[in-house]
């Protein structure tokens, strides 16, 4: 099985190293094509106004000056054009990709691009808690990742579907199983603007997020990782809401 690995945290990110280890537990044909720099939050964007710079940094390892979607396209359409991958793995992201994170995430986008190109694709993320990004428990993803991926492949991934996997903020031995979960919803009032001034007195701004204080819904990815369970969420490329499609169609016919 040929596996193509990418991420959005960049070619030197510890989560990418973790995912390479996971991939090598599944196959001896692992290729890495990842962004040259951190691309967190770029979602499914493409580099349309800048050239893509490709640099080989090791055996089967490439860095692209571009987004995660660019990396998958370069991997499939250029680097591996004569023998395309059987599986795309994107991650392991530094922090969970649950609820609305899915719409912003470059990690999810890497798997999404693979799905668009007709390749089975899985996004993986490692949650962190009060200890912050400096204290991520990468061993959780590293230990449980191969088994979870094998199970997903055994179940099968239908065309047009990608799978979003989130590992909880705990040690491997403290994981309380796997939960197949729906995408949750946060209180987006948590999103704030942090206004500052530079040394010349000019204003600049950072996006900031207040600490979440809400009860996650049952059966959601948010609830799963809060309970130290691995969340597995199938996502559809087709974003059409079928009930609303019917309702709108009826209204426009009236």
UniProtKB/Swiss-Prot annotation:
Any Gene Ontology CC annotation: cytoplasm
Required cofactor names: a divalent metal cation
Localization annotation: Cytoplasm
Binding site for a divalent metal cation: 8-9, 40, 93
Documented EC number(s): 3.1.3.5
Main location: cytoplasm
UniProt entry keywords in alphabetical sequence: Cytoplasm, Hydrolase, Metal-binding, Nucleotide-binding
A Gene Ontology molecular function term of the record: 3'-nucleotidase activity
The keyword Transmembrane helix is assigned to this record: no
Assigned protein family: Belongs to the SurE nucleotidase family.
Protein name per Swiss-Prot or TrEMBL: 5'-nucleotidase SurE
Gene from which this protein is expressed: surE
């Amino acid at each position: 099985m040929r596996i193509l690995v990418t991420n959005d945290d960049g070619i030197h990110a510890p989560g990418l190293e973790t995912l390479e280890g996971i991939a090598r537990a599944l196959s001896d044909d692992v290729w890495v094509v990842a962004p040259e720099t951190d691309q967190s939050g770029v979602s499914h964007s493409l580099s349309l106004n800048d050239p893509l710079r490709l640099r080989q940094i090791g055996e089967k390892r490439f860095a692209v000056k571009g987004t995660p979607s660019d990396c998958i396209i370069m991997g499939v359409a250029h680097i591996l054009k004569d023998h395309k991958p059987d599986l795309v793995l994107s991650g392991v992201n530094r922090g969970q990709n649950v609820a609305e994170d899915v719409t912003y995430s470059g990690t999810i986008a890497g798997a999404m691009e693979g799905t668009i190109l007709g390749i089975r694709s899985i996004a993986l993320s490692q949650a962190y808690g009060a200890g912050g990004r400096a204290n991520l428990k990468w061993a959780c993803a590293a230990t449980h990742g191969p088994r979870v991926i094998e199970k997903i492949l055994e179940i099968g991934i239908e065309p047009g579907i990608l799978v979003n996997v989130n590992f909880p903020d705990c040690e491997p031995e403290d994981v309380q199983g796997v939960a197949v979960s729906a995408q949750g919803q946060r209180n987006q009032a948590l999103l704030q603007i942090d206004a500052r001034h530079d040394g010349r007195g000019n204003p600049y701004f950072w996006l900031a997020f207040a600490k979440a204080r809400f009860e996650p819904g049952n059966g959601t990815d948010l609830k799963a990782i809060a309970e130290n369970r691995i969340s597995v969420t199938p996502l559809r490329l087709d974003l059409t809401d079928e009930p609303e499609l019917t309702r709108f169609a009826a209204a426009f016919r009236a």
